């Protein structure tokens, strides 16, 4: 069993696992319990009262975090029709079938997000089994299958994130870095919470959000009040 460092033990003692914290206190604790030497990611988990087996309760979407993510996203645009627009908008890689082949044959993944124009989707099917598990398959619901590649690139570079409920009804996402100010983290948290409420399936009965947990990379989970 891996040894728990003195620092890890001390920060775990700061968090009462049974307590549900007000947002301001939860964010303060998350920053205080960041134990990594690098700038930890601040993560958010929603446990939702949904049944993802039902088509009308499969939650998926995307939004731009107002304070950004703290990470520079590399964008690959797959297109035959919007090459210049993609290049002018600041895409890191732009191409067509030759880049699909590169992914397929060379296991090339030097990018974080794929944006594709509609005519490329049939060709992308050849590597769907590779992209799917990595969460890289473009999808109209998240705005990554589009003719407006400039808008898609701009949003991603500004801090767009995607979210999707897993088979247990949980959504895992991020709200920034431990180096962010408390106000930046609060602003991003509120934006995500409002979006979660907006996409609530109409068929859900009773409480929709069961609990929310905030944590940093390798840090303890902190339960947050739902308002």
UniProtKB/Swiss-Prot annotation:
Transmembrane portions of the chain: none
Signal peptide range in chain numbering: none
A single GO molecular function term of this UniProt record: tRNA binding
Biological process, per Gene Ontology: regulation of translation; translation
SUPFAM superfamilies (UniProt xref): Ribosomal protein L1
Cellular component annotations (GO), alphabetically ordered: large ribosomal subunit
Keyword set, alphabetical order: Repressor, Ribonucleoprotein, Ribosomal protein, RNA-binding, rRNA-binding, Translation regulation, tRNA-binding
Family statement drawn from the similarity comment of this UniProt entry: Belongs to the universal ribosomal protein uL1 family.
Function as written in the Swiss-Prot or TrEMBL entry: Binds directly to 23S rRNA. The L1 stalk is quite mobile in the ribosome, and is involved in E site tRNA release.
Complex and partners: Part of the 50S ribosomal subunit.
Protein name: Large ribosomal subunit protein uL1
Organism field: Mesoplasma florum (strain ATCC 33453 / NBRC 100688 / NCTC 11704 / L1) (Acholeplasma florum)
């Amino acid at each position: 069993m891996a040894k728990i460092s003195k620092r890890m033990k001390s920060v775990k003692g700061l968090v009462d696992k049974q307590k549900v914290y007000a947002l301001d206190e939860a964010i303060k604790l998350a920053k205080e319990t960041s134990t990594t030497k690098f700038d930890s990611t601040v993560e958010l988990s929603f446990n939702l009262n949904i049944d993802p087996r039902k088509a009308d309760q499969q939650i998926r979407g995307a939004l731009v975090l107002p304070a950004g993510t703290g990470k520079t996203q590399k964008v690959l645009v797959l297109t035959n029709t919007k090459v210049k627009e993609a290049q002018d908008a600041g895409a890191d890689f732009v191409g067509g079938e030759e880049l699909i082949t590169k992914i397929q044959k060379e296991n090339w993944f030097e990018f974080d997000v794929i944006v594709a124009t509609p005519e490329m989707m049939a060709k992308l099917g050849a590597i769907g089994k590779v992209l799917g598990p990595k969460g890289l398959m473009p999808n109209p619901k998240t705005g990554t299958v589009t003719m407006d590649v400039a808008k898609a690139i701009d949003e991603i570079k500004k801090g767009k994130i995607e979210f999707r409920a897993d088979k247990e009804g949980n959504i895992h996402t991020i709200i920034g870095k431990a180096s962010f100010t408390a106000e930046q983290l609060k602003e991003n948290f509120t934006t995500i919470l409002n979006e979660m409420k907006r996409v609530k399936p109409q068929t859900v009965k009773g409480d929709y959000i069961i609990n929310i947990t905030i944590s940093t990379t390798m840090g303890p989970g902190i339960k947050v009040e739902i308002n």
